[in-house]
């Protein structure tokens, strides 16, 4: 898989036999660039993943997915990689989990993957972010891995070795029980009853 940002990228990837394409966050933020990619993909059957735009704009993200879908591509997915912020105290990109959760509500059949490497920006944050994504029912993870992360040409601080990635994946707890609206309503009712008793 590889990232495409222009029609030329698409043509070169298809010529090289790349099997999955993704649209990066900066490209997703530009509807003209997304349309150029969508036009280049017309008549092609290839999986395309669309990262969230750098700014927290759900409509822009959905718009990019729709442009590619309208070009005839059916195998689409979304990648949540967090959102740019001046405040980089903890994360490189703020997760703002409510945005991909709303994307899931609006497009329930769309696979959504999490990119904990770009959210965290530091390799020590990758494992807890992987677990958090799984707890939020993401469909999968896209984790940056390198045999010698410190020598990686880009994003070295957020990459983990293949052995560390294997360790992280083996420690993940995958929850099988999902909450329904009805079960959440029942829990809210029980909480309200407890609150009412404590006020007496």
Q: What feature does the model see in each segment?
A:
Residues 1-35:
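Active-site beta->alpha loop and helix N-cap motifs at the rims of alpha/beta catalytic domains
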Residues 3, 115-117, 195:
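Conserved acidic functional residues
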Residues 11, 38-40, 187:
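Short, flexible, solvent-exposed loop/turn segments with mixed acidic/basic and small polar residues
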Residues 18-19, 139, 195:
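Receiver (REC) domain switch/active-site residues of two-component response regulators
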Residues 29-167, 171-173, 179-180:
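Catalytic alpha/beta core domains of metabolic enzymes, predominantly
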Residues 119, 185-188:
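A short beta-alpha structural unit
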Residues 183, 190-193, 197:
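Charged, solvent-exposed faces of alpha-helical coiled-coils
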Residues 200:
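Conserved small/polar residues in nucleotide/adenosyl-binding loops
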């Amino acid at each position: 898989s590889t990232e495409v940002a222009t029609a030329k990228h698409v043509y070169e990837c298809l010529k090289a036999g790349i099997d999955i394409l993704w649209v990066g966050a900066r490209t997703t933020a530009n509807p003209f660039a997304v349309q150029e990619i969508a036009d280049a993909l017309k008549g092609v059957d290839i999986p395309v993943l669309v990262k969230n735009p750098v700014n927290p704009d759900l409509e822009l993200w959905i718009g990019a997915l729709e442009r590619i879908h309208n070009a005839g591509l059916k195998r689409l997915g979304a990648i949540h990689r967090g959102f740019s912020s001046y405040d980089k105290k903890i994360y490189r990109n703020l997760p703002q989990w409510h945005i991909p959760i709303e994307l899931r509500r609006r497009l329930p059949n769309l696979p959504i993957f999490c990119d904990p490497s770009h959210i965290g920006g530091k390799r020590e944050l990758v494992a807890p972010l992987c677990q958090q994504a799984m707890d939020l029912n993401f469909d999968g993870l896209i984790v940056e891995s390198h045999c010698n992360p410190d020598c990686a040409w880009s994003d070295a601080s957020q990459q983990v070795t293949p052995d560390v990635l294997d360790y992280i994946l083996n420690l993940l707890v995958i929850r099988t029980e999902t909450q329904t609206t009805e079960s959440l309503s029942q829990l809210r009712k029980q909480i309200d009853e407890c609150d009412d008793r404590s006020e007496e």
